[in-house]
Each structure stands twice: as structure tokens, then as C-alpha cells.
Amino acid sequence: AILMVSTTPVLADGHTDTGLTYGPRPAWLISQMDDGALKTRLQACLSQTPTRTDFSIGHRGAPLMFPEHTVESNIAAAQMGAGILECDVTFTKDHELVCRHAQNDLQTTTNILVSDLADTCTKPFTAANGDEDATAECRTSEITLEEYRTLTPKMDAADARAMTAEEYQGGVADYRTTLYST
């Protein structure tokens, strides 16, 4: 679900540390390290019990594992101990506020290019051609809140060598996962 701005207190506020987890990523990253003192030290940390802290900020939620600025991403950040959930704000065509990193990133963070809203993009999809990368630009300010809510969030990425809008939707960075992006 795509996140909207609200005056309601954020998820992390007032919740206890019950059920906090770092998730599988830290253990997996440590397992990929070469054997040595640092790996041994980090492995010892895996048995720690997570606690919520204001020092931990959910920047756009938990965007390494979930599409950024989504309800799911913010819930994951809170469950991993983020005491603060940061929400960048932009506006829709009908002047509603929504959580977005940028005004012009719908082409890389949602399915807009392969939806009925593709025609609203300020720069329609253009396929890669020779040395020129594929391009597109779609802005939150070009669609209404109702239209915005129809979009499906995805990991922030694009395939610069794409020949079709469908291919452009791919290209997820190696440090992110699409495991939870449905």
C-alpha cells in the first residue's frame, strides 16, 4: 500500500519493544563476509535483543527490503527498532499530501509506466537507443490522490537499457531484494 500523510502519531510512537527483530538481512550479510575478527565480532551481535531507539531512523521505511514510503516499509522499520519514521512529503494534482522521496520518481518506484496512468507522465517512456539510455519521468503532481492510490509500489529501480516500459520496471540494485515486493 502506498503511504499518505496523516496527523496521526507514527507507528513507532508509543509501541513497546515486544516483537522487534532485525530480520534476516544482517545475519545474511555477515555470513557473506570473509572469516576474520570483524566477522566473529559481528556474529556475536546476532544474539542481541533489538530495542527501539530514536537513534535508529526508518528513512523512507525499510527500503532495502520493501518499496520505500509504503505502509509495509514503515511497519518493517518500526519492527526492526526504528524509533523515528521519516516521511518526505510531496503533493498530488488535487493538492493532497503523500509520502514520497521526490516529486518526479513514480517511473522508478511504481508501476505507472505499465498502468492506465502512463499517459500522465511528463516524459513518456522512451526506449534505449544505441548509447542513449531509456528514459521516462512521471510526477506525483500530475495525478490525483485517487489515481495515486491505484499505483502499485515497487523497489526503486529502472533498467536503463530497456526497450519496453515493462523491461524498464526491472533493474533492481544488487543490495535490494524483491522478495517482499508484491
Regions found by a protein language model. Give the residues of each.
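Bacterial N-terminal signal peptides
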Residues: 1-6
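Phosphate-group recognition and catalysis centered on beta-loop-alpha active-site segments
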Residues: 9-182
